[in-house]
Every structure is written in structure tokens, then in C-alpha cells.
Amino acid sequence: MRKEIIGMIVIGTSLLLASCGSRGEVKRGADGKQVLSGYITLSGAFALYPLAIQWADEFHRLHPDVDIDISAGGAGKGITDVLADQVDIAMVSRELKPQEKEKGALAYAVAKDAVVATINANNPAYKDLLKTGLSQKQATAIWEGKTKMNVYTRSDACGAAETWAAFLGKKQEDLKGTGVFGDPGVAESLQKDVNGIGFNNIGYAYNDKTHKPTKGIAIVPIDVNGNGKLDADEKFYDTLDELMDAIAKGKYPAPPARNLYLVTAGKPKNPVVVEFLKYVRTKGQRLNGPAGFVHI
């Protein structure tokens, strides 16, 4: 689990910077070449936060006069912020809603990942689920509160919950369970609750260094064909690399596999935003795989 971000995901400096108005310009350097300078702000999905940090670090190395501030608070917050002109770019882990498009939101696909069902590694139900897989019907019953398991969902408006709900044919507000803020919060709750089951973005379900499931958490396999058993071609959860390959090949269902987006309010005019988006969708794609994401 990406513990290094927990202390900084809620409070960032993006609003402080945005209050002064975002700046960006292209100027001439001492050698006569064009130099990009200024700063931009991003807010939104926990799912994209770790990858966005890597993109920002490399972009800053390429353009030392550019600063990028990033904060995570859920896809819903990102959309709200960008449409209110509080940030330049929203990180969004779901499809845009019609009303968001009507307000001028423009989405740029930048990566692909998935939401997975997660469970306490010592949950008594886990052994059976390894044999049968979790069918859509079973998952629906769990998040309707019809089982004895302790069910967790998200309390914040987020792409992960909307994506998992879409897999069940529902909306986020239909999901029953204990609401917890953020991906790290759900993962920590499951680690402490032997009877717990929930869902996470894959970046928090797996350890980013070992690519194995996060300590104390297990990944619940999906019975994709609904035949009541986990077939050989449905077994791809042991490592993050196996799951990423399954997502890329379409073996893991969509939803809960999904595209991830950077979103702007209308066509961006800030040259730093324009160049950053170009970078992310071209050279920046090489960082997707090592970070646990599928490139577009």
C-alpha cells in the first residue's frame, strides 16, 4: 500500500496556489531556446495520484522552471475543483457525467487500471472464494448487506466506488456498508477486520515494490463466466503484473476495469497545462507500466 501519501492526501497547497491564479508562459532562455515556466495544480482521484506524482517529477526535470502541485481527495472533488477554477487539471477515475460535459469538462485518457474486491487475508470466506470466485450476483448480495461479512465502501464521492457499483449494475449511493474515506482508509479497515470485505484501486490493493497483495489483504478473484468455479484463465491475481496483463488483454471485466483521465475545464490556454498533457499522453506513458498501470 502506498503509505507514503497518507499524510498528505487531504491537505495540499493547490487551493492556496489557485487563489493567486495559475500562471504559465514560454520565454527565451540565455541560449535563445524557448523555456517553459510557471506552475499548475491538480486535484482528484486517489487512483491516479501515485502515477501523477511520477509524471510531475519527470516533467519538472525536463522543465526545471515549472512547478506542479498535486493533491488527492477523490474524483468527485477533482471535478468540483476544476469546474470551479480552483485547479488546472482534475484526476478522474470514471467516465464524465453528462452534466459535467455540459459545464465544459474535457477528458483525456491517460492510463487504464481496475478496481478489485479486497478482503482480510484471514477472512473465513476467502478460502471458498478462491475456489468459486466472486460472481456478480454474489457481489451484489454482499453490497446489498445480505451476508454476514463486514462490508466496506467509500464515504467520499469517488471513481472507485462508482466503478465497483457499475459492475453490480448500481450507483455509488446504492452500496451498503461502512463508509470509509479514501483508498488507504479502506485498506487499513480491512487489515484490522478479519471479517471485512471491500474494494480498492489496484494501486492500493498491491504493494508497489513487491507487486504482491498488500500485507494483511487478499484479492478476491472474479468468476467472470459465472459458472460457479474459478477456471484456469480466471486466475491472474497473484501479482500486480499478472492482473495488469489480464486488464490489457480484456480478461478482467470492464467495469471494474476502467480508463483513467485528466480533465480540464474547456480547452486549456495555459501553455504549461498544454505541454504537460502532451507529455503525459506521449513520453509519460512509459512510466505507466512500472507504476502498476496499463498504458493507453
Task: Please give the residue ranges for each predicted region.
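Bacterial N-terminal signal peptides
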Residues: 8-16
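Conserved functional loop/turn residues at catalytic and ligand-binding sites
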Residues: 86
